[in-house]
Every structure is written in C-alpha cells, then in structure tokens.
Amino acid sequence: MKSNLYNRWFSVLLVCLLIFVVSGCSKDEGGTQVSPDEILGVKGDLTVQFSARFGTEPFAAAKGYAYQGKQKVMFSKVEFYITDIQLVGTNRAASDQAGLINLTGSTEASKNISLTGLASGHYTGIEFTLGVTPALNKKSPRDFPPSNPLSLSGGFWEDWGSYIFTQILGLVDPEGSGHFTNGFAIQTGTDECSVKVTIEKDITIKESKPASITLDVDVLQFFKQGNTYYDLIADPLS
C-alpha cells in the first residue's frame, strides 16, 4: 500500500468515474411528488443498482479490453464499499446499511444494494460515502454479523487497522498478443481516502411500490490521466 496522499488521489479518481448516469423508476405513475410530511411514519424500499461499462463496451470480468497503445487489460475484481447512504431533500432519510459493490460479480445482487425502511416521500438526490466512514472504520469485521458486508475479513487490513475501500485487480497484455502476463492491484483505504458522493435525482419512496435507480459507471475513466492513461506496467501496485 502506498502513501495516504497517493491513495486519496485514487479515491478521488474513482469518484470521477462515478459521474453517474442515473435512471430508473422513482416516481409514482401519475408523477405526483409526495413529501415525507404527507406520509409520516410510512416506510418504503429503494434498490440502488450499479451498471458498469468500459468505454462503450459492457463491462465483465475476465474479458480483454483495448487499453493504451497495443495493450489490453482484463479485470478479476472491481469492488468498493459504500456507507452512510442518505436520501436528501427538504427532509432526509438515512440508512445504516453498508454495501460492497462488486462490478465483476457473477450475479446482479453483487452489483446492487437494497435499502429498506426508508421514510416515504419525495427526495431530490442521494448521498453516500465511497469507502467506509471513520466511525465504522474504527471497527473490524468481528464487530459485525455475517450478513453485513463489513464482516468480511478479506476486505480489511489488519496491519493498518482499516477497511479496504476499493479494490481493482487484473492483468495486462503488454503487446496485445493475447497473453495477459502482467498483474496489477490498486487498493485504497484509511480515513483520508473516504470520499462523499452526492447525486441529484428525483426519488419517491412509497410503501406500496419499491423504487430503484441505476448508476452508470465507466471503469475506463478511472485510469485516465489527461490525454493518456495510468501506466499499469510501470506502476502496477497501489
């Protein structure tokens, strides 16, 4: 693991790739906006779905993508924690649920987080921490039940006393020959690397109709540095 400043830089880059295209069903059929005050005490659910691509191509694990020059790249893991999720507007609806989003997962459930028990009403956006909040990061996997993604020991650095906020692992084919021989591993963690993300979006939570939004993630943009891309051959570890 490199310096906190270096990892903070990667965390900010990850937020840049999470310049989401937001879509989905979040209003009632008539388009009526309902405030939390109008349905006081009623709860509803929201599914946040993450849809990944690599440039213009659909994203998947173990698939080769053109990178820079002759190089090709494939990924075995792209995952990140999100915590402190809140719907924002005139009022707020907070969730204490944590999510571990695995864009290379084999199931749709690994790319989603389902939030339950949210106060019904109309909201104008969603906020979350990309990573693990300092309060939660003081804890360790043994402090959480098995159903909580923060219970996973593979997502925690014992020596650093921190969760691994993001992990991007894969292989590079240096010559575009079909031989993926060079590995790389990018990981971020520690309190300085958690980043707050705010996305504007009309969201209506109703008891009778679970809502959903989709966040579009371009993984290629994570590696972009000006007019070129991060050198995964010269600097494969972070």
Where are the regions that the model predicts?
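Hydrophobic helical h-region of N-terminal Sec-dependent signal peptides
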Residues: L14-I19
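A short, solvent-exposed, low-complexity linear motif enriched for acidic/polar residues
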Residues: S26-S238
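Bacterial N-terminal signal peptides that target proteins for export
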Residues: K2-L13
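C-terminal motif of bacterial Sec signal peptides marking the signal peptidase cleavage site
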Residues: V21-G24
